[in-house]
């Protein structure tokens, strides 16, 4: 049995949840999201609490219902608080700027990298060396942050590149004479 799946998902005030068959729809102050649960998992809404349980005692159902509960919890958190990832840019001349709906990154290449901001994602640049990616879908926020980081991942010698704000870069010692 999944320890994550056993816990119920509480619906916060100001959020409405609706379960229709295998689809869970959540509407909150930041937007609307929906998630379709696998057929091996049953979903039940009672008293502003969503409970998830496996329909069968198979290994697949056991493994899927904890995941389904986590996804539903992310739906509720996304429409209430939203998700945010912060990126830092380190390096001489490395910087970021927003130009319309594009993020322009100067990362030491011969040309600037232009990243189009996807729908449902908000990117802000408080400083030229900081990028904040926000949205209501945790998977998309993480994916966009990973794509931006992928243009110039931090290198282990000087630490130059794009890294997550809480990421630690293991430094290597340079060549010895």
Curated annotation (Swiss-Prot):
Q: Does the keyword Transcription apply?
A: no
Renumbered to this chain, the signal peptide range is none
User: What SUPFAM superfamilies does its record include?
Assistant: Ribosomal protein L6
One GO-annotated biological process of the protein: cytoplasmic translation
Q: Which InterPro entries match?
A: Ribosomal_uL6-like (IPR000702), Ribosomal_uL6-like_a/b-dom_sf (IPR036789), Ribosomal_uL6_a/b-dom (IPR020040), Ribosomal_uL6_bac-type (IPR019906), Ribosomal_uL6_CS (IPR002358)
Domain of life, per the record? Bacteria
Tell me the PROSITE patterns matching this sequence.
RIBOSOMAL_L6_1 (PS00525)
Q: Which GO terms describe its molecular function?
A: rRNA binding; structural constituent of ribosome
Q: Pfam families this protein is in?
A: Ribosomal_L6
Q: Which UniProt keywords apply?
A: Ribonucleoprotein, Ribosomal protein, RNA-binding, rRNA-binding
| Gene Ontology CC entries for this record | cytosolic large ribosomal subunit
Q: Gene3D superfamilies given for it? A: Ribosomal protein L6, alpha-beta domain (3.90.930.12)
Q: Give the PANTHER family listed for this entry.
A: 60S/50S RIBOSOMAL PROTEIN L6/L9, LARGE RIBOSOMAL SUBUNIT PROTEIN UL6M
Instruction: Indicate the quaternary assembly.
Output: Part of the 50S ribosomal subunit.
To which protein family does this belong? Answer: Belongs to the universal ribosomal protein uL6 family.
Q: What does this protein do?
A: This protein binds to the 23S rRNA, and is important in its secondary structure. It is located near the subunit interface in the base of the L7/L12 stalk, and near the tRNA binding site of the peptidyltransferase center.
Q: What is this protein called?
A: Large ribosomal subunit protein uL6
Gene for this protein?
Answer: rplF
């Amino acid at each position: 049995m999944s320890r994550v799946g056993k816990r119920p998902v509480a619906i916060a005030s100001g959020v409405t949840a609706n379960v229709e068959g295998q689809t869970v729809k959540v509407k909150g102050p930041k937007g609307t999201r929906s998630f379709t649960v696998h057929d091996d998992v049953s979903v039940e809404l009672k008293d502003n609490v969503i409970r998830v349980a496996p329909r069968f005692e198979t290994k697949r159902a056991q493994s899927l219902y904890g995941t389904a509960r986590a996804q539903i919890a992310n739906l509720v958190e996304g429409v209430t608080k939203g998700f945010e990832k912060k990126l830092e840019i380190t390096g001489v001349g490395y910087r970021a700027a927003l130009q319309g709906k594009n993020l322009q990154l100067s990362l030491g290449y011969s040309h600037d990298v232009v990243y189009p901001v996807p729908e449902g994602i908000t990117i802000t640049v408080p400083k030229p060396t900081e990028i904040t990616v926000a949205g209501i879908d945790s998977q998309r926020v993480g994916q966009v942050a990973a794509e931006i980081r992928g243009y110039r991942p931090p290198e282990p010698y000087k630490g130059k590149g794009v890294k997550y704000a809480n990421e630690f870069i293991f430094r290597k010692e340079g060549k010895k004479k």
